[in-house]
Amino acid sequence: MKNRNLIYLGLYAVVAYLLYKKFSNKVSVAEAKEVLNDWKKNFDSKNLDGIVNNYSQDGILVSTFGDILTGREAIKEYFIGLFKKDKLSVDYLDEPQVMELNGAITLTGLYQFNYSENGKMTNVKSRYSFICKKTNGKVYIIKQHSSVAN
């Protein structure tokens, strides 16, 4: 009887551990929105290290003004060029649509890039999708897609 109780206790511990591992990396909507807000703050302040660190090591950026980029180094190079624009900022135009996908969160919506070119303000309305996933307790953008909206 005592051995049986130990076996049940051991099985319970294993199941509890497996459930913890499965759900501990689940991203909440609040965490994903926090990453979105942090991304905007880093973008508006041209904080290169901050914005690059919003992405996972192997993050993918399908950029508005360039190519498909994979990894932080490629993403960094993209933002180095983009951050050269004067009066650069981004504004979210709506509340993001939220979808949970296997522990990750996808946020989609519209934003507008603003910058000065030849002394004239330019505004580029674009669509976005951010997929956020938690790794080792931190939420990262694993994929971002951005394209000009007509």
Question: Where are the language model's segments positioned?
Answer:
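Helix-to-beta-strand junctions that scaffold the AdoMet/dcAdoMet cofactor pocket
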Residues: S56
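Hydrophobic alpha-helical topogenic segments used for membrane insertion/localization
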Residues: N3-K22
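A beta-strand edge to alpha-helix "cap/lid" segment located at domain peripheries
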Residues: Y8, F23-V35, K40-G50, I60-N150
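Disulfide-bonded cysteine motifs in exported proteins
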Residues: M1-R4, V27
